[in-house]
């Protein structure tokens, strides 16, 4: 059945089978709550995969051999959370100033996102931040030249996409 004026349900709405489909440009309205936010409309949800990459700033004769590079993401509204694995072996004659993780699935809105990582090969932890306007994050850490780093990461950031 199709109703042009809307349907009001007094108690609960249960779908016995199938999906709840919301038309493009609309979402779930939480305005009945007493929050003071600027938007109470949940209008975006997405999950998927991406391929992260490692780059650098500074240093000399830097090269990066990449083994595994796999990532997943969940986007709810403007908040993106990524988790990924990078298995890399950097080589250099002088160390880079910092390392860049690139290839995030959505552009970073503001530089307030954070990233945490762990090197499974030597139990080292990393922390960093996202970069405004790009699809990347930077971190300051020592990745030993010629030594494999099997790293695991998670990051959360805001996007306008």
Task: For the regions a language model picked out, list residue spans one by one.
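Residue-level detector of buried hydrophobic side-chain packing
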Residues: 80-82, 104, 155
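Extracellular attachment/recognition segments
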Residues: 103-140
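Surface-exposed ligand/attachment interfaces on beta-rich extracellular proteins
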Residues: 32-41, 49-76, 85-108, 142-149
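Intrinsic low-complexity, repeat-rich intrinsically disordered segments enriched
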Residues: 1-59, 83, 90, 118
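Short, structured beta-strand segments at or near domain termini in extracellular proteins/domains
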Residues: 149-161
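Beta-strand-connecting loop/turn residues
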Residues: 18, 26, 78, 135-136
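Generic beta-strand structural signal
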Residues: 15, 75, 130-132
């Amino acid at each position: 059945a199709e109703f042009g004026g809307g349907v009001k349900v007094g108690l609960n709405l249960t779908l016995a089978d199938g999906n709840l489909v919301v038309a493009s440009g609309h979402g779930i309205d939480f305005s009945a709550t007493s929050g003071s936010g600027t938007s109470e409309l949940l209008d975006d949800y997405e999950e998927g995969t991406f391929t992260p990459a490692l780059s650098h700033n500074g240093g000399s004769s830097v090269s990066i051999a990449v083994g595994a590079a796999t990532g997943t993401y969940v986007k709810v509204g403007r908040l993106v959370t990524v988790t990924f694995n990078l298995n890399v072996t950097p080589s250099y004659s002088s160390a880079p100033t910092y390392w860049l993780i690139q290839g995030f699935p959505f552009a970073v809105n503001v530089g307030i996102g954070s990233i945490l990582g762990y090197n499974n090969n030597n139990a080292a932890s990393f922390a960093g931040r996202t970069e405004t306007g790009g699809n990347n994050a930077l971190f300051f850490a020592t990745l030993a030249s010629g030594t494999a780093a099997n790293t695991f990461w998670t990051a959360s950031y805001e996007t306008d996409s």
